[in-house]
Amino acid sequence: MRSKSKRKFLKSIGSAGIFFAGANLPVWAINFSANASASDQSYNLLKPDQNNLMLIKGFTSRVVATTGKKSFKGSKYRWHKSPDGGATFPTSDGGWIYVSNSERSENTGGVGAIRFDSEANIIDSYQICKRTSRNCAGGLTPWNTWLTCEEHPRGYTWECDPFGQKKQIKIPNLGMFNHEAAAVDPETSIIYQTEDSGKGGFYRFVPQEKITGMGQLLDVKGKFQVMQIVYANKVQWNDVPNPLAKMKNKKNDFDLMKRKENKGISYTYFQRGEGAWYHGGKVYFATTRTNEVWEYNIKENTCKPLYRGRGALAKPDNVTVSNTGLVMAAEDRDNMEICGISKNNNSAFPIVRIKDHHKKSEVTGPAFDPSGTRLYFSSQNGKNGKVGITYEVTGLFNKLS
């Protein structure tokens, strides 16, 4: 434990961090068999490099975007403020696109994109979503679109074209609440969503048909449901009467499940549900307030903590998974690290640390290029609390375990 803030935070955690609403459920309803090891492995981060990043030996970094500056000289787009959640998309020429949310309020948010060629040269930069608010995290889809989530109680999820050729689409089917992130099962097109609030639900939208292209989510019929963990990690999904229920009193019905039409529905609530990512039949998501990363196994229909805050990782926020299945989480402040969760014993270990006193910032938007050798992420507000910086780190991530 390396900082006073971490020691204080971890000391305050006395429970598993999941709670039950709408039903009196027994304490033994959750089997916490996935406790993190007390001792974390370490790859011994080196001294800060020229970009003030502490990296594993053999890894290198570069800055690809800075708030207010052009990433590509031939573009009109200047990189946005408050870069947040992100993802990458392959292109037909062997390159890829990295998309990044802008977590700004009052319809000044949106999503920006950087396009790379097959040699990782930046060849374009542009905006794919605009005039939205507090675009926090989101989720990539199997049909190659980006779902960007508005983090405010009247927020929606918007579908965007990473190539910037089609207009953004608001998706009411995915509810109106304090959205954080989304993850899509490619087998069924079911969309899982987190809610960033003190008593937020973990939701899913089950479409009646498989989604194959942009815009189909707008009209498809389906069920909107909330998770309830009922016994030994087993899950049941309960229908939400009105996923578009309006907030009338911020103090009493900020959370979707506390709004009048939805009260009385049993559900398990999570404290500050954050980033989410699909990989290999599982959905991983973080809860920042309780310092945990969760694993929902779709086939087994179980949900349990993969990591509980007793080690290197504190205040997990955005989540991603490497090509080899290593779950990684970015910290909301604390030590400004991206940590991996070991596949051997579920302990956490730092992979990247941002130095140089980024005290008013957080690590956001981790995502790999298609090869799995380049990791993109941002310091949301940089050293001065105003200028976001987006990085690329190159290394043998597939060797980490």
Where is each model-derived feature located?
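N-terminal export signals
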Residues: 2, 8-31
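C-terminal segment of N-terminal export signals and the immediately downstream linker at the start
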Residues: 24-66
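Blade-edge beta-strand/turn elements of extracellular beta-propeller
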Residues: 48-67, 74, 116-129, 158-178, ...
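Beta-rich, blade/repeat-based domains predominating
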Residues: 79-93, 131-142, 176-189, 264-281, ...
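Well-ordered mid-protein domain cores that form the structural environment of catalytic cofactors
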Residues: 96-168
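Conserved beta-strand positions in repeat-built beta-propeller and related beta-rich domains
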Residues: 98-104, 148-151, 193-196, 285-289, ...
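Structural motif
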Residues: 107-112, 154-158, 200-204, 292-294, ...
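Blade-level signature of beta-propeller repeat domains, shared across WD40, Kelch, NHL, RCC1
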Residues: 367-401
